[in-house]
């Protein structure tokens, strides 16, 4: 009886590891999609209404995407609390601090941090050009993450289940 219970627990934990690895890949794609939408909103606000960055951050705190809300609420709080620091510094530190919580990969985080070089610094056209470059790079990174999910996601799940079955066969 103990062997059976132990076998079920080992199988469950190995399968959970495989499924967790697949879920992390899926979260990376979802986070990239959400941040692409946020960058699109920032770009449209800068080009259309010439809205200042603190107001844009306020708009994004009410976004329906939980990833966007989390990042920009943290940024808005930091803007209020640490108003002596530049927007670029706060943007970078917020994105790096929230990276693991919202499921972004290191590559996506670095790409988004590059937007700090443009936001709030230059005239609207320079900001839009910089944001377009960041969006293109993030879209390419998102496609790579989607490809990883398609190629490796099922592999991780299957390997987790197979490892669980292998351990059970060895134990029994």
Please provide the spans of the model-predicted regions.
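Membrane-interface, cytosolic juxtamembrane amphipathic helix immediately N-terminal to a transmembrane helix
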Residues: 27, 33, 114-161
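Amphipathic alpha-helices that form helix-helix packing interfaces
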Residues: 38, 42, 68, 75, ...
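Bilayer-spanning, highly hydrophobic alpha-helical transmembrane segments
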Residues: 6-17, 143-172
